[in-house]
Amino acid sequence: MSLNASWAQRFQDAIPFGSSTCSKTAKYAPDEPAVIVRGQGCRVWDADGREFIDFRNSLGPVTLGYRFPAVDEAIRRQLESGVIFGHPHPLECEVAELICQVIPCAQQARFLKTGGEAVAACIRIARAITGRDHVIQIGYNG
């Protein structure tokens, strides 16, 4: 049995449908590798050493590719200072200021922990501004 097949079985045994994200499950992409073990640039490798071009971009957040030098260096620097503080960090303010510079109509920026929290905040703001109670929604979430 290949390492990829072994991992596929372990995922099926440990996680419903073999994936925590429906879009990653082998049910929808049976010819794709069961597991990716590393990435470089736009390429990823599975447990059997096969190389693929990652057209998914890790489902969105890896727009610069894997192991992008400037991103990796920024992560290393931040790790040396610590992460996830219970108080504001200067980087939070610097990024908010940059967002306000880049987006002409933005007067302030706020960061939230999850997409669900961000959507809930947007709905509250929209309801407060419009005075309306109903919201129509449709979309894909993972």
Where are these regions (language model features)?
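Active-site-adjacent loop/helix segments that line or gate small-molecule/cofactor pockets in enzymes
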Residues: M1-R38
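Short, hydrophobic/aliphatic alpha-helical segments
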Residues: S2-R10, W45-R50, C100-Q101
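Short, flexible segments with low predicted structural confidence
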Residues: I15-P16, W45-A47, A70-V71
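Short capping/connector residues at structural and topological boundaries
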Residues: S20, Q40-G41, L64-P69
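Short active-site-proximal "capping" loops at secondary-structure junctions
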Residues: A29, G41, G60-P61
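Active-site and channel-lining beta-strand-loop segments
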Residues: A34-D54
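Glycine-rich loop-to-alpha-helix module at the N-terminal edge of alpha/beta enzyme cores
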Residues: E51-H134
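Substrate-binding/gating loop at the entrance of the active-site cleft, primarily
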Residues: I138-G142
